[in-house]
Regions:
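Selective detector of the "anchor" transmembrane alpha-helix that sits immediately C-terminal
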Residues: 187-196
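Short, Lys/Arg-rich N-terminal segment immediately upstream of the first membrane anchor
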Residues: 1-7
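Amphipathic alpha-helical segments and their boundaries
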Residues: 8, 12-61, 74, 102-117, ...
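Long, amphipathic, charge-rich alpha-helical segments that form helical bundles/coiled-coils
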Residues: 109-131
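Generic structural concept
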Residues: 48-58, 62, 81, 85-88, ...
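Juxtamembrane amphipathic/coiled-coil helical coupling segments that flank
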Residues: 27-44, 62-69, 94, 98, ...
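Extracytoplasmic ligand-binding sensor domains of the Cache superfamily
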Residues: 74-111
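Juxtamembrane segments flanking the first transmembrane helix
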Residues: 5, 50-52, 56, 89, ...
Length: 196
């Protein structure tokens, strides 16, 4: 009688242990996937959105610099200048927000953006002096040469920054999919062992 009882209880206990182990692994894997999903949503996507705002404001700023050249009258110049100051303030805010999430993989692209942004501000200050002293020929030359080059470099730096963020998000997504595949494989193996 004891041997029949043992023959029945050992497989039942083994199945119970496998079921408990499978449940624990499933919970741990689900938690890992959830954490990775939260990381993607709260960090990478927010950062990509922030880079988008930074890009949009930077493009508006570069367009406004050209508007400053053709602004006629003190009121029009003041309006454009106020808009430029507002955009610079926005960009500074976006840069501070971005710096909060910056990691070592993004530092090169961000450093490049900051460098070209600084060059743009320097070139714009010169342009502003030319316009304010009615040196329209010099202002036009600067705008059509140096400022164009800096704006193109700035746009390229923003593209690199965006690509860096998208690559980081893609990497995180691949990690999440790998965790999901591992969870499915582990669950499948445990199921086969339990049935077998």
């Amino acid at each position: 009688m004891n041997s029949v009882k043992n023959k029945i209880m050992i497989p039942v206990l083994l199945l119970a242990v496998i079921a408990v182990a499978t449940s624990i692994l499933s919970i741990m894997n689900a938690d890992s996937i959830s954490k990775k999903g939260d990381d993607i949503a709260n960090n990478y996507l927010v950062t990509i959105e922030n880079v988008g705002y930074l890009s949009e404001s930077t493009q508006k700023l570069t367009r406004s610099a050209y508007s400053y050249i053709v602004a006629e009258g003190d009121a029009a110049k003041k309006s454009v200048k106020d808009n430029i100051e507002s955009l610079k303030s926005e960009i500074d805010g976006y840069m501070k927000d971005y710096e909060q999430t910056l990691d070592e993989n993004e530092e090169t692209a961000y450093s490049s953006y900051k460098n070209y942004y600084s060059q743009f501000l320097t070139q714009f200050a010169v342009l502003e002096k030319y316009v304010d002293t009615n040196q329209t020929v010099n202002a036009s030359k600067l705008a059509n040469n140096n400022l164009v080059d800096v704006c193109n470099s700035l746009e390229s730096a923003l593209d690199n920054l965006t690509n860096s963020e998208v690559e980081a998000a893609d990497h995180a997504m691949r990690q999440m999919h790998a965790l999901s595949a591992f969870a499915k494989t582990t669950g499948g193996v445990c199921l086969v062992v339990a049935i077998g």
